[in-house]
From Swiss-Prot:
Lineage: Eukaryota, Metazoa, Chordata, Craniata, Vertebrata
Record gene name: Tmem213
Compartments reported by the entry: Membrane
Residues in the Cytoplasmic compartment per record: 101-116
Main location as per UniProt: membrane
Organism: Mus musculus
The entry's keywords: Membrane, Signal, Transmembrane, Transmembrane helix
Bilayer disposition of the protein: Single-pass type I membrane protein
Name of the featured protein: Transmembrane protein 213
Gene Ontology CC annotations of this record: membrane
Length: 116
Protein backbone atom coordinates (compact mmCIF):
# COMPACT_ATOMS: atom_id res chain seq x y z
CA UNK A 1 0.00 0.00 0.00
CA UNK A 2 2.84 2.39 0.76
CA UNK A 3 4.23 1.96 -2.72
CA UNK A 4 0.99 3.03 -4.39
CA UNK A 5 1.19 6.37 -2.56
CA UNK A 6 4.68 6.88 -3.95
CA UNK A 7 3.44 6.24 -7.48
CA UNK A 8 0.56 8.66 -7.04
CA UNK A 9 2.84 11.42 -5.82
CA UNK A 10 5.13 11.10 -8.83
CA UNK A 11 2.94 11.00 -11.98
CA UNK A 12 6.01 10.68 -14.24
CA UNK A 13 6.02 6.92 -13.65
CA UNK A 14 2.37 6.56 -14.67
CA UNK A 15 2.52 8.18 -18.10
CA UNK A 16 4.06 5.27 -20.01
CA UNK A 17 2.32 2.44 -18.15
CA UNK A 18 -1.30 3.30 -19.14
CA UNK A 19 -0.27 3.96 -22.72
CA UNK A 20 1.47 0.60 -22.97
CA UNK A 21 -1.47 -1.15 -21.32
CA UNK A 22 -3.95 0.49 -23.68
CA UNK A 23 -1.86 -0.37 -26.71
CA UNK A 24 -1.47 -3.97 -25.58
CA UNK A 25 -5.20 -4.34 -24.91
CA UNK A 26 -6.03 -2.86 -28.32
CA UNK A 27 -3.74 -5.32 -30.08
CA UNK A 28 -5.24 -8.23 -28.17
CA UNK A 29 -8.78 -7.02 -28.85
CA UNK A 30 -8.20 -6.59 -32.57
CA UNK A 31 -6.58 -10.04 -32.74
CA UNK A 32 -9.48 -11.56 -30.79
CA UNK A 33 -12.07 -9.89 -33.03
CA UNK A 34 -10.36 -11.00 -36.22
CA UNK A 35 -10.15 -14.58 -34.95
CA UNK A 36 -13.76 -14.43 -33.74
CA UNK A 37 -15.07 -13.40 -37.16
CA UNK A 38 -13.27 -16.30 -38.81
CA UNK A 39 -14.73 -18.83 -36.38
CA UNK A 40 -18.22 -17.36 -36.58
CA UNK A 41 -18.16 -17.43 -40.38
CA UNK A 42 -17.02 -21.06 -40.36
CA UNK A 43 -19.74 -21.98 -37.85
CA UNK A 44 -22.42 -20.35 -39.97
CA UNK A 45 -21.66 -22.71 -42.86
CA UNK A 46 -22.15 -25.72 -40.60
CA UNK A 47 -25.72 -24.83 -39.68
CA UNK A 48 -28.58 -26.38 -41.62
CA UNK A 49 -29.56 -23.96 -44.37
CA UNK A 50 -32.13 -24.68 -47.04
CA UNK A 51 -31.71 -22.44 -50.09
CA UNK A 52 -34.69 -20.94 -51.85
CA UNK A 53 -35.50 -22.48 -55.22
CA UNK A 54 -34.17 -20.50 -58.16
CA UNK A 55 -31.24 -18.91 -56.31
CA UNK A 56 -27.52 -19.35 -56.81
CA UNK A 57 -27.26 -21.14 -53.45
CA UNK A 58 -28.53 -24.30 -55.10
CA UNK A 59 -25.36 -24.46 -57.23
CA UNK A 60 -23.00 -25.39 -54.40
CA UNK A 61 -20.28 -26.92 -56.60
CA UNK A 62 -20.04 -24.07 -59.12
CA UNK A 63 -17.24 -21.51 -58.79
CA UNK A 64 -18.68 -18.10 -59.66
CA UNK A 65 -15.49 -16.14 -58.92
CA UNK A 66 -14.08 -16.12 -62.49
CA UNK A 67 -17.42 -14.91 -63.86
CA UNK A 68 -17.79 -12.32 -61.11
CA UNK A 69 -14.26 -11.01 -61.73
CA UNK A 70 -15.20 -10.39 -65.38
CA UNK A 71 -18.44 -8.55 -64.57
CA UNK A 72 -17.85 -6.83 -61.25
CA UNK A 73 -15.39 -4.19 -60.21
CA UNK A 74 -12.88 -5.05 -57.53
CA UNK A 75 -13.96 -4.06 -54.05
CA UNK A 76 -12.50 -4.31 -50.57
CA UNK A 77 -11.57 -7.91 -49.88
CA UNK A 78 -11.73 -9.56 -46.46
CA UNK A 79 -8.24 -8.38 -45.51
CA UNK A 80 -9.14 -4.84 -46.49
CA UNK A 81 -11.99 -4.81 -43.99
CA UNK A 82 -9.65 -6.10 -41.29
CA UNK A 83 -7.11 -3.41 -42.16
CA UNK A 84 -9.82 -0.75 -42.02
CA UNK A 85 -10.99 -2.00 -38.62
CA UNK A 86 -7.43 -1.94 -37.28
CA UNK A 87 -6.96 1.57 -38.69
CA UNK A 88 -10.09 2.85 -36.98
CA UNK A 89 -9.00 1.12 -33.77
CA UNK A 90 -5.68 2.97 -33.87
CA UNK A 91 -7.53 6.23 -34.48
CA UNK A 92 -9.72 5.69 -31.41
CA UNK A 93 -6.69 4.58 -29.39
CA UNK A 94 -4.99 7.85 -30.31
CA UNK A 95 -7.99 9.83 -29.10
CA UNK A 96 -8.13 7.85 -25.87
CA UNK A 97 -4.43 8.37 -25.25
CA UNK A 98 -4.79 12.10 -25.84
CA UNK A 99 -7.60 12.23 -23.28
CA UNK A 100 -5.61 10.16 -20.78
CA UNK A 101 -2.60 12.42 -21.29
CA UNK A 102 -4.74 15.49 -20.66
CA UNK A 103 -6.22 13.94 -17.50
CA UNK A 104 -2.76 13.00 -16.23
CA UNK A 105 -1.60 16.61 -16.59
CA UNK A 106 -4.45 17.98 -14.44
CA UNK A 107 -3.59 18.87 -10.89
CA UNK A 108 -6.06 18.37 -8.03
CA UNK A 109 -6.59 22.15 -7.74
CA UNK A 110 -7.86 22.49 -11.32
CA UNK A 111 -11.48 21.68 -12.15
CA UNK A 112 -11.93 18.73 -14.47
CA UNK A 113 -14.50 20.42 -16.72
CA UNK A 114 -12.30 23.05 -18.36
CA UNK A 115 -12.95 23.99 -21.96
CA UNK A 116 -10.72 22.09 -24.37
Amino acid sequence: MAQSGVFLRNPGHLTSAPQAALLFSLVLTSFHLSCGTETSSSNSTLSAHHPDPGTLEQCANVDFCPLASLCCRASVDEYGWIAAAVGWSFWFLTLILLCVDKLMKLTPEEPKDLAA
